[in-house]
Each structure stands twice: as C-alpha cells, then as structure tokens.
Design a protein with these regions (language model features):
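Active-site beta-loop-alpha junctions enriched in small/polar residues
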Residues: 69-71, 110-112, 144-146, 193-198, ...
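Hydrophobic core
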Residues: 12-24
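Bacterial Sec-dependent N-terminal signal peptides
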Residues: 1-11
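Sec-dependent signal peptide cleavage junction
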Residues: 21-40
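N-terminal substrate-binding region of glycoside hydrolase catalytic domains
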Residues: 39-138, 144-169, 192, 263
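Aromatic-rich peripheral "rim/lid" segments of glycoside hydrolase catalytic domains that contact
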Residues: 50, 54, 254, 286, ...
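Structural preference for beta-strand elements that scaffold enzyme active sites
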Residues: 61-65, 103-106, 138-140, 187-192, ...
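Active-site cleft segment of glycoside hydrolase catalytic domains centered on the general acid/base Glu
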Residues: 121-124, 150-259, 268-288, 303-319, ...
Length: 379
C-alpha cells in the first residue's frame, strides 16, 4: 500500500509540472514574506543578558555615557543611519539609546581641528548637544585644549599657543566656548577638563598643570556647570592618591574652584575591573564627596584572534560599571566612539544595526528591554 501511495504521488506531481509548462511563475516579494512569515524569536543575546541583575547603588547620578563625537560627520558626510535590534532605522538615535539605558551623551571638542580631526569641531558639538538635550539626555563636553585628540603621552598645544601663556589662553578659551554653547542653547550638564592627562596638562610642569586645571574648573563652576577631570590611568591604582592631593592643593589656590568628578581612561587589555575597584576605593578614602567615573573606555566585540564577541563586550561593560559603583560612589562610565557605525568596538555594526551589548546599560538598572530580533524563516 505504501508503494502505491508513493507511485500515485509521483504521477500527480509529474502531471502538475506538465500542466504548468510555459507558465511564468513570479517569485514572492521578499517584503511580503517578511510581513506574512517573519516570526519574532528570542535571540541568544537576550538569554545572555537576563543573567545581569541591577547593580546595587546605581541611580540617577550614575553616569551612563555614550560618546557621540563622530555623529555629525557620520550623519551629514557619510550618510550613515542607525537601526534598532531588528534592523529597522530609528527616527531619533538619541531617544533610542536613552531607551536602552544611556543617560548622558558626550562629545569631544578641539580648539582648531582640521582635516581628519574636523569631527571635533565646536560647531558639530553644538548640534549634537542640542539634539541630545531635546531627547532628555544629560550632556558632557570634553575640552581637549589641543587641535586633536590627546593621550597620556601626547598633550599637544593648539597652534598659536605658547607654553608660557598656555594657562591664560586655556582659561580664556574655556570662557569663549561656554559663552558660545549658551548662545546656541547647548549648555552641557558637565564639562570634562582635558583628556587622559598624565602630569602634563598644557605641557606644563605637574604642579602648574594642576593649577591651570583648577583655575579652569572655577570658570566652569562659575557658569553653573559640573566639572570633571580626565586622567591617564596610573600604573598602580593607588597612585591616584597623588593626583587627588595635588588637585586639592591647587583648588585651594582659587576660591570657588573644585570639581565634581574624577575620571580615569581605561584600556581593557591593561586594566581589570579589580583595578577600577581599587581606584574607586582610593577616591572614596582620599576625596570624599567626589564621584569616580571611567572617563573613557571601549571594549571589542570583534578581534583578530576571534576571542572577542558581543557576549564578552557586554560582560566587560557590566563588570567595569559595577566596579565603579557602591553606596558611597554613584560611579559610571562614558563609552568611547559609541555612535560609530561599523567599528569593531562600538554599538552599531556595518549596517548600522544596534548590537545587544548596548542594552546592558538598561539591564544594569534593572530594566529588561527587548533585544529580540526578527528572523525570516525563508532565509
């Protein structure tokens, strides 16, 4: 009987093919398939995220920052777009990252950036800050006091500035920037003075550099804006004590000077979360009332050795964030190049689609946002 059924089925299929000869068969539209057959599936990434619980001590004062310094260049010159986890373009990327737990947008600003550094312009920063503020986000401006990005071993003065007048020029420049931001309706929530300073702010001696930072901090605070400093990570975490002491002495020199945040730039291949915990503990002990944050960090989701993944990126961010937070320190971090489409350590792939690691900022606050993606069963 089974053989008879197979024979009948074969004859029917052959007859159907014969009847359809000469007939053009139009393929189903991909969009039609997506609309009628696409199913929502819970991704492995979502399962991975559920193990991350709310961090004790996290709150409104915790800095959950994303650097968007490249945003204007990507949007206007490179015509990049940003998409959600389902690959659908979002109408407002600032509102979108806010929905994923980000509460602060940060931009870097150079004095006279040119060519490849043009993305660091004050004009770009104004536009990004205004968009971020409109989306209900806090904002941070990192003033580089250089014409390009600065690092621990490279604090190059802007063109036309001399070392002997650098402190005066820097304070004057700061006032000008704050005035321009105010006129543009882009006054930030906080200003970070310098980036990855390593005892060499404005190429001055250690003490003179700290004094210059303190004087600038007074200018910022006089404008009603919170201040932060960004330092290169010392070889030993406990060495942050020396920086704290020098800042304290320098701030005493200028009545009204002070700071709200002390930030350290972290590199995952060098600094562990245990290192960050020691930084936090030292700041708590030696600078009570000051908030220790990671002023810049980025973790790879892809590397040449094939060891990095979205899962490892997610874990690194959570561990670093947790290391900065306890009941005494609201902590937080600013994720560098967060907006960069296609970078191996950003939150958006080459197509602009968000990766689930972005959602760790929400999960760290106890909010389990939906990171499920659509899978087309025809593909």
């Amino acid at each position: 009987m089974q053989k008879v059924r197979k024979l009948v089925t074969t004859i029917m299929i052959a007859a159907l093919i014969t009847a359809m000869e000469g007939t053009t068969i139009l393929p189903l539209s991909h969009h039609v398939k997506a609309d009628t057959n696409t199913v929502s599936q819970t991704s492995q990434a979502e399962n991975d995220l559920t193990k991350y619980k709310k961090i004790n001590g996290i709150g409104d004062n915790t800095v959950l920052g994303a650097d968007f310094s490249h945003y204007q260049l990507q949007k206007n010159a490179w015509k990049k777009v940003w998409k959600n986890y389902k690959g659908i373009e979002v109408s407002n990327v600032f509102e979108y990252v806010r929905s994923q737990g980000i509460n602060t947008i940060s931009v870097k600003v150079a004095v006279n950036p040119a060519k490849d550094d043009s993305y660091l312009s004050l004009e770009y920063a104004k536009e990004t800050l205004k968009e971020a503020k409109k989306a209900g986000l806090k904002t941070n401006v990192v003033l580089l006091y250089s014409d390009k990005i600065t690092y621990g071993n490279s604090q190059e003065l802007p063109g036309g500035w001399s070392v002997d007048k650098a402190a005066e020029e820097a304070n004057k420049y700061t006032k000008t920037v704050l005035e321009e931001l105010k006129r543009a309706g882009a006054t930030p929530t906080m200003v970070t003075i310098g980036n990855e300073v390593n005892y060499n702010f404005l190429n001055l001696s250690s003490w003179d550099g700290y004094c210059a930072m303190a004087e600038i901090s007074k200018t910022v605070k006089d404008a009603g804006i919170k201040t932060a400093f960004s330092f290169a990570a010392p070889e030993k975490a406990s060495d942050i004590q020396y920086i704290i002491e020098q800042l304290g002495y320098a701030c005493e020199k200028y009545e009204g000077a002070g700071y709200d945040y002390i930030g350290v730039n972290i590199y995952p291949n060098t600094h562990s979360d245990s290192y960050v915990k020691e930084l936090k503990n030292t700041v708590e002990e030696k600078a009570a009332g000051k908030q220790m944050i990671i002023s810049s960090v980025k973790c790879p989701w892809k590397d040449s050795e094939g060891k990095a993944s979205i899962t490892t990126q997610t874990k690194s961010i959570y561990d670093y964030l947790q290391a900065t937070i306890n009941e005494k320190n609201a902590g937080g971090l600013i994720y560098d190049d967060a907006d960069f489409v296609g970078a191996w350590d950003s939150f958006f792939d080459g197509n602009g689609q968000a990766m689930s690691s972005l959602a760790i900022f929400a999960y760290a606050q106890g909010n389990q946002v939906d990171v499920s993606s659509y899978k087309d069963p025809w593909e």
